[in-house]
């Protein structure tokens, strides 16, 4: 048994961020690595209860803050360091995942990994899962189906290029968070690597795709596309939103029912791999 909370790993550009790992007494040798989404963090909402769910089922569970998500090692919640948020790229997030795997390797021997990515984290789960040998399966929760489609087009893209930065508002904190144009140039430089359709169509690892029926942040069509490319069935969680009825902060002691159903469906997928 092992429980590590708010330890520090070194991610992209040697930036330090917070990480949790729990290994249960009855460990089945498999560790789930959870990747949060855009403007998220490891302790958002009910993610701690997701961790508890899988640990109780015998899985190890690791959740971490991406290195350039706006958090610090002193404060991993919300966005106390907007400059780091502005410097984020998909390559940074991919490097973070690689470093997290190495960090786990230093703590645990002979483990098999599974990645779960929420929203934008689902894209990182697919990109990283394609090449990281310790990853044996990929689960996407309310994930985007394309990185390129999320960028502005036309005059808005030219304005971003000209200014070098644009701003996105966090509805909960009301912060105007910067995004540098390097986010886009990093994508264009690595467009083949970041092509989710290509990954889903060629990867030889099992993929589980789930989406909330009433998701207004990332439309369910994204889930349909990922499932079709992966030649698998989409797991639709009925009558729920992008975060499966969870909110931040989450003060209840139990998972919201849609998120519980998602955990059960994901666990069923993982069990069937054995």
Language model features: what each stretch is:
Residues 107-118:
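Alpha/beta-hydrolase fold nucleophile elbow
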Residues 47, 205, 218-228:
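Short alpha-helix in the alpha/beta-hydrolase fold that links the catalytic acid
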């Amino acid at each position: 048994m092992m429980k590590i909370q708010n330890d520090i790993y070194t991610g992209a550009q040697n930036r330090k961020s917070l990480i949790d790992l729990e290994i249960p007494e009855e460990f089945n040798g498999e560790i789930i690595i959870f990747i949060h989404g855009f403007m998220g963090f490891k302790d958002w909402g009910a993610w701690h209860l997701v961790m508890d769910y899988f640990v109780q089922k015998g899985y190890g569970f690791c959740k971490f803050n991406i290195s350039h998500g706006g958090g610090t090692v002193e404060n991993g919640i919300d966005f106390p360091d907007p400059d780091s948020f502005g410097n984020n790229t998909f390559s940074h997030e991919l490097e973070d995942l690689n470093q997290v795997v190495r960090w786990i390797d230093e703590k645990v021997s002979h483990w098999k990994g599974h990645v779960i990515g929420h929203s934008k984290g689902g894209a990182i789960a697919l990109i990283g899962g394609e090449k990281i040998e310790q990853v044996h399966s990929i689960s996407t929760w309310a994930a985007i189906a394309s990185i390129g489609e999320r960028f502005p087009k036309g005059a808005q893209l030219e304005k971003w290029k000209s200014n070098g930065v644009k701003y996105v508002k966090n509805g909960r904190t009301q912060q105007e968070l910067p995004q540098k144009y390097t986010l886009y140039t990093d994508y264009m430089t690595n467009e083949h690597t970041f092509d989710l359709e290509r990954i889903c169509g060629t990867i030889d690892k099992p993929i589980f795709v789930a989406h909330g029926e009433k998701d207004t942040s990332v439309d369910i069509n994204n889930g349909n596309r990922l499932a079709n490319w992966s030649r698998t069935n989409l797991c639709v969680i009925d009558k729920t939103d992008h975060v499966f009825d969870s909110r931040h902060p989450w003060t209840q002691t139990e998972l919201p029912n849609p998120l519980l159903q998602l955990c059960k469906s994901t666990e069923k997928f993982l069990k069937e791999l054995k």
